[in-house]
Structure formats: structure tokens, C-alpha cells
Design a protein with these regions (language model features):
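Conserved GNAT-fold acetyl-CoA-binding loop/helix
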Residues: 38-62
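Solvent-exposed, well-ordered amphipathic alpha-helical segments
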Residues: 56-60, 64, 68, 154, ...
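Residues that form generic nucleotide/phosphate-binding pockets
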Residues: 31, 42, 60-63, 67, ...
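Acyl-donor (CoA/ACP) binding surface of acyl/acetyltransferases
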Residues: 1-27, 31-38, 75-209
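A short helix-loop-beta-strand connector motif used in the catalytic cores of GNAT acetyltransferases and
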Residues: 48-50, 61-77
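Generic, well-ordered alpha-helical segments
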Residues: 20, 31, 49-56, 70
Length: 209
């Protein structure tokens, strides 16, 4: 296993992945409050009878940072620098369930402030995260699970060239119920070069038809 240490910061053009911080709380809360209807159908929820208590934002950041230092996850904030502007907090990319040994895999989740959607920010951020997992952590496989109705998120995995692997019924508790999810996979052996290179080829390919 290749070595790594948290915190980790990655950048490509106008997009930066950096550790989620306690001082992100105000902007995080403003985004979620302003765009609650955008997020609600896709947000994970606690099933009835869940034993674990909810956490404050600060507690969540502390817990995530501890897991990151132990090599179990990568909890990134996504910063975007608009043309002529200053970096803004635009969303999150979280790599979780990092497993080594005979599996060498992880899961990736993400969200974006709808004000910045459609600019290629999340595909770029996930490509950076995937390349880091493959090249630095020596992972073999990354899974992205998406509700079949989430067309915006499905567009992200299409741009990344992720392979559809199948549907998992009642896979995750989302928006108050156990929901089916489609699973998409990136594998180290299937990428011709970096995931970022593949994304840029797809983004700049000429239109067909």
C-alpha cells in the first residue's frame, strides 16, 4: 500500500479539493437551507430505530478528520474559483469505506451547490479523488451508488466513463425510505491513463450527429 497522510489538498484548474473545516459550517448551512428541495430526494436519512445519535457539524468534522487520519476516509470540501473571482465553497466529495488487503476499494459520494451545477465541477472533483485513490492509495476499485431517478448524478458518472454494474434493491435509506441504487464502478485496470485524462477527452470530444 502506498503511503498517504491527511490532510490532503488537490487542485485542477478552477477546482480544489481540501479538507472539510469547522468554519465551513455557515456556508454549508446556508447552501442546505437555500436549496433544501434540491437535496432532499437524494440525502441519506436515518432509518427508524437507528441507535447512533445525530451529530453537530463540528462533531461531524471532528469525526471525519479522525477517520481520515486513520486512513478510513477522505472528507473533502470542493472549492470553485469562478472566472475573475475568489474561491467559494461549492460542495463536497467524500471517499468512504476505504479498504485495503484483498479488496482495495472505496465508495465515493458527492453533492454540489445548485448555483454552480453544470460547470463540470463535480466530475472534475471526483476524477481528482479517483486518481488519488488509484495512484497514491493503491486502490483497485471505486464504487458510486446513485438513485436511478437522479439524472444529474447519472450525468457525472457518464462523463467519468464509469461502468454500470447493476442495481441494488433497498440499498440505502434516503429521503425517508430504503431506496434502490444503481452502482457504477471505476477500476484501476480499466482506465487508459488517469481518470482526469478520460474526463477531459469526453468533455472536449466533438458532438456526434
Amino acid at each position: 500500500m502506498a503511503g498517504s497522510s491527511w490532510p490532503v489538498r488537490l487542485s485542477h484548474q478552477a477546482v480544489t479539493l481540501r479538507p472539510l473545516r469547522r468554519r465551513d459550517e455557515a456556508e454549508w448551512a446556508a447552501i442546505r437551507r437555500r436549496s433544501g428541495n434540491w437535496f432532499r430526494p437524494w440525502d441519506s436519512t436515518r432509518p427508524p430505530g437507528a441507535a447512533e445519535p445525530g451529530m453537530t457539524f463540528g462533531q461531524l468534522v471532528s469525526a471525519f478528520s479522525g477517520r481520515a487520519r486513520r486512513g478510513l476516509m477522505l472528507p473533502w470540501a470542493v472549492d470553485y474559483t469562478p472566472p475573475g473571482g475568489r474561491p467559494v465553497f461549492a460542495g463536497q466529495v467524500t471517499v468512504s469505506g476505504i479498504t485495503h488487503g484483498s479488496a482495495c476499494w472505496a465508495q465515493v459520494g458527492y453533492w454540489i451547490d445548485p448555483r454552480w451545477a453544470g460547470r463540470g465541477i463535480i466530475p472534475t472533483a471526483v476524477a481528482m479523488a479517483a486518481d488519488y485513490c488509484f495512484d497514491t492509495l493503491d486502490l483497485h476499485r471505486i464504487e458510486i451508488a446513485i438513485r436511478p431517478e437522479n439524472t444529474n448524478s447519472l450525468a457525472v458518472v457518464r462523463k467519468l466513463g464509469a461502468r454500470y454494474e447493476g442495481r441494488r434493491e433497498r440499498y440505502m435509506h434516503v429521503d425517508g425510505a430504503w431506496r434502490d441504487h444503481d452502482v457504477f464502478v471505476l477500476e484501476a485496470e480499466e482506465r487508459p491513463g488517469a481518470v482526469m485524462e478520460r474526463l477531459e477527452r469526453r468533455l472536449h470530444a466533438p458532438e456526434q450527429g
